[in-house]
């Protein structure tokens, strides 16, 4: 389609300055109609807004205002996986529901910032215009995280702690001790653990002979808590195995197959999430391994109650409440606070 440029007359751009000139008031008065309404009489503000609406002016440029004042009225949520992950993972769906509900109540916007971007190569600068960040169990050495810390912006961490910043978490080590001691009490001595990666791109199987290291504090806390419980009960950790993988049911199934094929003496699979546990039970069902008679399986989060007709033994936590408190801490001016939420070992048929 060809546009006739002779008829393409540009409409003059409406600004606060031009609006003020038309109304015969100051630039500041017009600005206050949107940004500081308490400084104007209701009648004057209504007069300005009504005229602005009549001529199609929606108000000051929010981006320009954010750049000028340093206040974007937006918080960023950073997580390890791709953007679509938070709309698929049950834990993160509940977490984001809590975050979003508090943002709505405070009239604050949200920006979702994934650390894993499939098309990205090299180091990308952090360009999001936000007032502060919620870090959702992130890899701490990621370039984006280091940029945030270097800028000194407001931060609240979820399921791990940074010195000088507020956090929200359950006692993850205590939760894993609960699971480990429960399984030990059932007589298990050969364990496999299915976990998300200890650091970016570290995947596969390894022994628990040595403490696990990396930069995903949540994963390290949970796995090493299990290892500590095993050692305290004279379990041979050289015959206990860890499988690190991508976080979903399919990879949980693959991990269970790899662990039980390579080490058929394993009698209990400890999964760091219910999603992993779903996959593990699916594999056991497919391989003809009775759960829990031949292989016990535990999860984490209490979001998958039953798999293949088997109730899942797991740790219950309130992810939605975690998100709500994170926003409250981020928007508050109070001192650094570490908020610990309750957790519960929920015993069902799988272990």
Placement of each model-derived feature along the sequence:
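Periplasmic-binding protein-like
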Residues: 130-136, 192-194, 242, 263-273, ...
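Hinge/beta->alpha junction and helix N-cap segments in small-molecule ligand-binding domains
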Residues: 81-94, 113-118, 168-178, 193-231, ...
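Short beta-strand-centered segments that line the small-molecule binding cleft or hinge
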Residues: 120-174
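Flexible loop/turn connectors
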Residues: 253-351
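Append "Primarily bacterial transcriptional regulators
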Residues: 19-20, 48, 295, 345
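N-terminal helix-turn-helix/winged-helix DNA-binding helices
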Residues: 2-14, 53-87, 106
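Short acidic capping loops at alpha-helix termini that bridge into adjacent secondary structure
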Residues: 189-190, 237-240, 291-296
């Amino acid at each position: 389609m060809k546009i006739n440029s002779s008829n393409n007359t540009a409409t003059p751009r409406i600004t606060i300055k031009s609006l003020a000139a038309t109304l015969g008031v100051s630039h500041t008065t017009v600005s206050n109609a949107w940004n500081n309404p308490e400084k104007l009489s209701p009648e004057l503000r209504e007069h300005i807004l009504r005229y602005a609406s009549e001529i199609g002016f929606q108000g000051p440029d929010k981006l320009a205002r954010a750049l000028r004042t340093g206040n974007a009225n937006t918080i960023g949520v950073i997580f390890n996986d791709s953007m679509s992950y938070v709309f698929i993972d049950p834990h993160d769906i509940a977490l984001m529901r809590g975050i979003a509900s508090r943002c709505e109540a405070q009239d604050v916007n949200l920006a979702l910032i994934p650390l894993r971007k499939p098309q990205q190569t090299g180091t990308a600068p952090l360009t999001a215009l936000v007032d502060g960040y919620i870090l959702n169990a992130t890899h701490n050495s990621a370039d984006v995280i280091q940029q945030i810390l270097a800028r000194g912006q407001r931060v609240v961490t979820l399921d791990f702690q940074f010195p000088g910043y507020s956090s929200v978490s359950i006692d993850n080590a205590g939760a894993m001790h609960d699971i480990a001691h429960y399984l030990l009490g059932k007589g298990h001595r050969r364990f496999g653990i299915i976990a998300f990666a200890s650091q970016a791109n570290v995947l596969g199987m390894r022994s628990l002979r040595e403490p696990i290291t990396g930069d995903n504090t949540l994963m390290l806390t949970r796995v090493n808590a299990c290892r500590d419980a095993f050692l305290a009960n004279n379990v041979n950790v050289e015959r206990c195995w860890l499988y690190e993988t991508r976080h979903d049911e399919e990879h949980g199934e693959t991990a269970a197959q790899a662990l039980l094929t390579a080490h058929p003496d394993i009698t209990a699979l400890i999964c760091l999430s219910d999603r992993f546990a779903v996959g593990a039970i699916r594999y056991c069902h497919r391989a003809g391994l009775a759960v829990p008679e031949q292989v016990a399986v535990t999860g984490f989060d209490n979001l998958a109650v039953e798999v293949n007709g088997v109730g899942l033994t797991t740790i219950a936590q309130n992810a939605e409440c975690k998100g709500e408190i994170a926003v409250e801490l981020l928007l508050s001016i109070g001192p650094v606070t570490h908020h610990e939420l309750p957790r519960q070992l929920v015993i069902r048929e799988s272990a």
